[in-house]
Amino acid sequence: MTATSPSLSPHLAMMGLSDGWQSVIRLDERSYQRSQDPVARLSDDFRQLCSEISASPCLVFCADDCPEFADSSLCELFSHWLTIDDVTSVSFCRAVFLLDPSLESGTAENMSKDSFPGLRDLGTTNVIRMATNGLQGLRSGPYFYQEASFHHMYRVFPDSQSAFFSAIAQNPISGQFIEHRPTDHVAVPSRLYSPPQNSKLPLSGLRFASKDVFDVAGLKTSAGSRSFFELSDPKPKSAFIVQKLTALGAVLVGKVKNTQFANGEDPQEWIDYRCPWNPRGDGYQNPDTSSSGSATAVSSYPWLDFAIGSDTCGSIACPAAAQGIFGLRLSTGALPHEGAFTISKYLDTSGIFTRSIDILHLVTSKLLEGTSELGRSPPLSEIQTIPSRIVYPKSSFPHDNDETIESIDRFIKALESFCSTERTTLDIDEEWIKTDPHGHKLSIYSELKTTTAHLHLAGFYDAIEPFQKAYRSTYQKNPYLDRVNTEKLKLARLVTIEDREKMVRQKALFANFAQKQILQSSDGSGAAGSLGGIMVWPFNPQQPQYRDNQPPLTPHVNWRWDVDYTAPLAGLPQVIVPIGQFRYESRITGEPDFLPITASIVGPPGSDIALLDFVSKFLIRTRGLLSVKPGRYIV
């Protein structure tokens, strides 16, 4: 039987095949897709009994979730589903299947809907109680029933902010990832298909998106470049971080966009793919740097729980701050970077974006369990999670916005009270000159002026030159590099062996300086993973950053030292915490509007879990923002 509109209930219309792997369906005011392959089929014993049920959305109730199948219990369970699952709706109530393992194999009963007045009032026309022959793989939840088969249902959400590179679903039988690209929508599965969270699957049912620098098994990686995607082969396995997250139960729903080769670019400089739209304020703000897609997806869509990104020199902190969400840059080396497109082996690490400190803490703690020596922390009960030192580098950042400075001051006062210690206002440049790691008595702005730039350029050369050679060999032409990357490669070719050796020495000196002189966390008295000292400063752009600004042509290379480079240069964990909003006059709308204010907190290398545990407890105690809203404003 082929499903067509006349055979469906009045509120359902089949829209045909969208891309060869799912059918698009309208249920009332919502769009859905069903899996092409069924997750279960009825045995011949049951087909005649169910023959009167045409292609239809349906609900499945398993005895484990509702043992007695009483009408009141079924209605109560369904009501609960509506609160926890954005796929389930009343439209699925038309047909109800009760899977009862106590029934003799091959037996089933078409029950009177009058015995289920609550379900009847919800629109149920068929209630079938049956043995579980061949249906053991079904979980309670919403499905699409067609030709004696049950299909998973995915709710289709528009990608209104152009954050996604592709939508991804995982075949529930084979485990194969299936990609739909290009896409203007994302289809997400019911959360009810995932088992309850437990010790083996602590992230079960959480939906996430991946920056398209991380490999996904069976799919190609673009790294933000059409030429790179063209040359790429489907990957034999997923990147380590993707493997770990899915093994913990998280559900991958798509890849999100990034700048070409994950380099810093302004919105007008994106060429191969369209820059995502930051939803905050007037809607015309810069989403900021290479992980823009990851941050935009999280700041825009309530149906997405978290996203992963990569960081070379600010690609976690910058978009998290610009979009007012929680972001964590993991300690460099805390997680294997295997299967990720890498710019600099000295700087690159992974990161996580969420709207909730609880989800950030949960995902990070489970992700880092048993991954590396740096990522392995002792139990929190055995380490120091309240910092003994709060550093405020007041002279090292701009003071362009009074609301931002006042907000960060209130935030630090609350930290002082919570930690029972006063801030240490530190001039990092003065401390550097006093410590004099190089023995030159020079300013940090002079000694480290080229360090970050050379680290970035050397890594960029090492990543792009082999790609260009392989592309020319395959296609007998050069791959496309946008203007930013073309200029960057010119500079990268000028980096000498001496420059490389010097930058590695300088990075090591700064990392030691940051730990011993700034955080004062390397005295040997604390357990691995303990906090010791933290440094706090405002990270948000203190003025509007409009996406239609026409930037001058630059390679986006940082020929300077900046406090914002502390985490990548010293390999520290960095968490971005939304703390408020500042008012501005939008030149787009001509009206007053608001943008996020965020604080940056860094801790010692390897203290990722302890740092998040501290931030979570602090926000709870001081009634800070535990979560932010998606959309125009954070609160």
Task: List where the protein language model places each region.
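Short glycine/serine-rich loop/turn segments
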Residues: 201-347, 537-554
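Structural helix-boundary/capping segments
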Residues: 2-18, 306-405, 409, 414-417, ...
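Beta-strand elements of modular eukaryotic interaction domains
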Residues: 197-200, 230, 237-243, 525-526, ...
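Amidase signature
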Residues: 1-201, 369-561, 630-635
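Electropositive, surface-exposed helix/loop patches at the edges of structured domains
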Residues: 284-306, 344-345, 349-351, 462-486, ...
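Generic structural signal for individual residues within well-ordered alpha-helical segments
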Residues: 243, 361, 501-504, 612
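Short amphipathic alpha-helical segments and helix-helix/interface helices
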Residues: 239-242, 294, 412, 515, ...
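Extracellular/periplasmic catalytic domains that process cell-envelope and extracellular macromolecules
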Residues: 199-203, 246, 298-300, 384, ...
